[in-house]
């Protein structure tokens, strides 16, 4: 619980924002620590909310839509929604159990109020009762504030962000609220317009509520929408509980696993099946620096790793939806045709710099789009083939045209594997011969032979292994980051999942080098050395979880458990992670919430439980082999449980807009 003063205009105290000067010389408020954000969403849109319940990012219609709130990227013109007590307050928050519905509790000297934030979603009326992919969602952010004890004055402030701040907001009155160019704000109480801003003060006594809805500007507004919010909340809660109730994992750290699974599901875009890397753009990897990227896109590699994590928990619909998305993105000479796509399957992701925005804490530029879509990364072919192997072995299908495309892709890899690329980390430097990329080319051909039921690539695979052994291993026996370099790369910690043949002792030597060069008490750096960009980034959360995999594989079970516990302690108060963590301060860095961080947590927790019950021999084989074994073990364990699992009736999470009078 943290203590704060009340909002602007509160009596009996002074409100002082911390201030610093950006590199441009402009004053700006000290930004909300990324660690202090929670997230709500509905598999279409997403919102980031601070500990004090201020909405600082909100994209309503889709993840990549122009946000109506983006204060975290510019505290002057970015837009926000703020409702907080007028008196000094203490605040605590949590997610409602097994949901992505956020509850924030304000406590003042005079009373207590509970804030509920959610974005409505549920089962589509035409979907089957067990279909958790075909969804109905409303492009709304709903906030319900209920005084539970005593009384409280709540101050409401909203500034809409329009067109990334390039347009002056226009505000006009409508029934029950105001229309903003780009959105509407409905409110159960009177609010005032002050130029582009909306404000009001509401006095609540115990049992009374303040109800707010921020909705996309194109939405028709039903007359009684504010009276329907409790029904929408019930449906949304039921959906999330029903979805997470299908999770097969019941082992240690189940709460952390379920929270990570809920985060991954929230980052799926239901209309197409795409999975985004994170919910935001341009949250910096270096505070005040230029390592600021747009992650509201679907990286093929990150998505397939997310689906490994969801598959091991027993989910099958999301992988099938992504398979359709991926093959629909284009069937060129090779598959996939690029490493990242837009959430609607867009190929052109031209990177633009929004130079008029201050950036998070003065971190410029703010970027929209991502130039990585033009990069050549050889590891992606192995990641896709590896996942498709698992997908088919768990009952998924591959049509003949898709198999033919995979054959062409394997032929391409067999011909071009010896060429340089940008690597797993998308370095914006000259292409290099990344060792992990070479190993993943071997994985691509190995898994292709399984999928195609052939042995056509044995000879080139032997050549790949010889080349990695000759040029990819340093004199001290560890895997290099690149040929002709003695640097080490933390992505090598994923080697145990590849089944790539290495000389005896190579993996242990690699772990030792990573421990010596990249590990800190808070986490693991990706790499050291020049990558074509300025500044030193933080430790990478996913790498921290990968370390325990390598430790387990080399028989260090106790050390792996201790390291996993260390990584769990790095989560924020609601169990979420950004991309990176500052090694000294513990401050979150990078976009939020980060899919790669959460899928790595799931992988680590399941792996620890897997080894505990199956012994170290279960770690042999490929990533797909491990997942299949883990799924079988979970199914057997759950069948042995005598207590039936509580279920949510499918009718509880049916979102029928017509029946609710919202269609």
Over which residues does each language-model region extend?
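Acidic, mature catalytic/reactive cores of soluble proteins
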Residues: 2-663
């Amino acid at each position: 619980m943290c203590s704060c003063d009340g909002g602007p205009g509160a009596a009996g105290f002074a409100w002082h924002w911390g201030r610093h000067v950006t590199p441009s010389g402009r004053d700006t408020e000290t930004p909300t620590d990324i660690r202090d954000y929670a997230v709500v969403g509905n598999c279409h849109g997403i919102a980031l909310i601070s500990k004090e319940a201020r909405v600082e990012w909100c994209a309503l219609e889709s993840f990549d839509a122009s946000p109506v709130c983006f204060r975290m990227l510019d505290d002057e013109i970015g837009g926000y929604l703020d409702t907080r007590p007028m008196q000094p307050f203490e605040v605590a928050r949590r997610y409602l159990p097994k949901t992505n519905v956020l509850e924030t509790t304000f406590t003042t000297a005079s009373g207590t109020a509970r804030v509920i934030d959610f974005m409505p979603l549920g089962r589509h009326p035409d979907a089957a009762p067990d279909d958790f992919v075909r969804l109905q969602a409303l492009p709304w952010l709903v906030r319900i504030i209920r005084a539970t004890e005593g009384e409280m004055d709540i101050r409401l402030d909203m500034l809409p962000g329009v067109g990334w701040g390039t347009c002056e907001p226009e505000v006009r009155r409508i029934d029950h609220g105001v229309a903003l160019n780009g959105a509407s704000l409905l409110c159960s109480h009177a609010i005032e317009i002050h130029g582009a801003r909306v404000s009001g003060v509401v006095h609540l006594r115990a049992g009374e509520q303040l109800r707010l809805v921020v909705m996309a500007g194109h939405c028709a507004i039903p007359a009684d929408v504010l009276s329907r919010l409790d029904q929408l909340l019930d449906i949304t809660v039921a959906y999330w509980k029903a979805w997470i109730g299908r999770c097969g994992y019941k082992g240690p750290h189940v709460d952390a696993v379920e929270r990570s699974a809920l985060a991954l599901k929230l980052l799926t875009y239901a209309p197409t099946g795409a999975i985004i890397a994170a919910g935001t753009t341009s949250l910096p990897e270096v505070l005040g620096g230029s390592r600021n990227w747009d992650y509201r896109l679907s990286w093929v590699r990150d998505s397939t790793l997310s689906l490994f994590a969801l598959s091991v928990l027993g989910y099958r619909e999301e992988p099938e939806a992504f398979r359709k998305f991926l093959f629909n993105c284009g069937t060129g000479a090779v598959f996939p045709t690029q490493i990242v796509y837009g959430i609607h399957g867009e190929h052109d992701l031209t990177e633009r710099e929004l130079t008029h925005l201050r950036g998070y804490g003065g971190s410029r530029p703010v970027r929209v789009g991502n130039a990585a879509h033009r990069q050549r990364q050889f590891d992606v072919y192995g990641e896709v083939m590896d996942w498709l192997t698992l997908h088919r072995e768990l009952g998924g299908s591959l049509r003949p045209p898709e198999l033919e495309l995979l054959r062409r892709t394997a032929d391409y890899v067999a011909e071009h594997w010896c060429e340089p690329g940008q690597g797993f980390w998308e370095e914006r430097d000259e292409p290099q011969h990344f060792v992990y990329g070479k190993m993943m080319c071997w994985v691509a051909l190995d898994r292709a032979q399984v999928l195609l039921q052939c042995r056509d690539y044995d000879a080139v695979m032997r050549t790949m292994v010889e080349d990695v052994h000759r040029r990819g291993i340093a004199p001290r026996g560890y895997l290099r980051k690149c040929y002709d370099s003695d640097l080490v790369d933390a992505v090598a910690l994923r080697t145990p999942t590849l089944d790539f043949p290495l000389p005896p002792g190579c993996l242990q030597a690699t772990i030792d080098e990573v421990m010596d060069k990249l590990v800190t008490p808070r986490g693991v750096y990706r790499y050291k050395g020049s990558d074509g960009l300025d500044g030193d980034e933080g430790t990478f959360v996913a790498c921290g979880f990968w370390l325990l995999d390598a430790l387990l594989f080399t028989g260090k079970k106790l050390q792996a458990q201790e390291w996993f516990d260390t990584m769990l302690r790095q989560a924020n108060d609601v169990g979420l992670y950004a991309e990176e963590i500052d090694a000294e301060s513990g401050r979150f860095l990078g976009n939020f919430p980060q899919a790669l961080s959460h899928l790595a947590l799931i992988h680590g927790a399941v792996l620890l439980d897997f080894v505990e019950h199956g012994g170290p021999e279960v770690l042999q084989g490929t990533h797909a082999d491990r997942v299949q074994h883990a799924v079988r073990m979970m199914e057997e364990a759950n069948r042995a449980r005598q207590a039936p699992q509580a279920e949510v009736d499918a009718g509880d999470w049916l979102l029928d807009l017509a029946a609710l009078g919202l269609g």
